Amino acid sequence: GYVTDILTDQAIKFIQQPRDKPFLLYIAHKALHPNVVQRDDGRVVNIGEGDFVPAPRHEGLYESEVYNRRPNNGIAPLDKPALMQKIDSLPPLGPETATKEKTIRERAEMLMAVDEGLGKMMQELERLKLLDNTIIVFTSDHGYWYGEHGLNEERRLAYEEAIRIPLLVRYPPKVQQGSKPDNMVLSIDLAPTLVQLAGEALTDKFQGRSLVPIFENSVENWRSSILIEYYSDTVFKKMKSMGY
């Protein structure tokens, strides 16, 4: 079967289980990643380099689609500090290494199974009369480059395209439908948000901040800056060359 559909089916089976207390369902789809297998020794191997496989029913769905690139497409950041110019393990930008339109289309087609899966889970919650009493959070771990800054098929530098990701929250008792706040939020804000929405008291052990005041339009003194760090060897090498 198609792994996105399998994960969706397992999630729905979990939702259907009889229970007398609230539940937490966390589902992390592998869709948008290339076609890989895990060997018995734990190694993860690409079985088709750059091979992005949509569900059979979605193959060719966007075959004629052309995705507009951003104005900074193909412009290498040579005026930036060495830390921001490239990832050492990646080849330089060029006709052979640039992200192809086919790759972008196939990844968009892969997303269709994710979209359908979320819809099926919401339909099941509605059938069980749980939908409006369930907090639904949809987000990602990072963005991607498709030629922006002269960088391709990566995300390990702190550019806007890599660090600014979707965060969608549905919870009618607290979140106004159609609202689009522009506050700067982080993934570490999710834990205190869910704890507060569940009716529990917050402690100073949380690194993040609850988003409930944003939902209620009562936020004060929200953050205006963030620190981005990553464990990539590239970063450490460049910092060392800068005297750190």
Named regions from a protein language model:
Residues 2-6, 12-21, 26-185, 197-205:
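Active-site-proximal cap/lid insertion segments
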Residues 22, 142-148, 188-191, 196-244:
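C-terminal cap/loop subdomain of S1 sulfatases and analogous C-terminal strand-loop tails that border
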